[in-house]
Amino acid sequence: MSDGRDTDADASVTGSDAFAGVPDEFQRLWTPHRMAYIQAGREPHHEECPFCAAPEKSDEDGLIVARGRTAYVLLNLFPYNSGHLLVCPYRHISTYDQATPEEVAEIGALTQVGMRVLRETSRCEGFNLGMNQGAVAGAGVDGHLHQHIVPRWSSDANFFPIIAKTKALPQLLGDVRRTLASAWPR
């Protein structure tokens, strides 16, 4: 029950200069909700590696866009943007330095083709490429090496993730997989 007084008038705002650390030009995007996803990989009920299981499925069921000799490309089940691809070796290795020269070459070649196909099919304006190796580095599946290819557009960030805790993805994963797989060179 309110007594009618304006309690906001008594509130003070602490300036950023009062916090620990040295101010810099970087903005921070704090995502503590991702810790549940990151730490879930360490629990015993996650016995099957999703990147070892995917190639055993049909391309449609595994969301696989393309298969090479030593590596393959699939859609991220939890995409940052529509068309978010992952390039994985078939072998279950956890770090880039464990990859053979053949795997390194094919991961690189599949990444290049993936970028070209995404640019052609989605008209993206840029990419984020990267590998998070180890849970401490933010890898959701830290036991199996995978490279992210995230297509970017100048307008892909909006208020939804901040206000509504929702990421707007305009295409269903199956539709994206079909589009990219059909555009992939044979």
Predicted regions and their residues:
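HIT superfamily nucleotide-processing domains
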Residues: 1-186
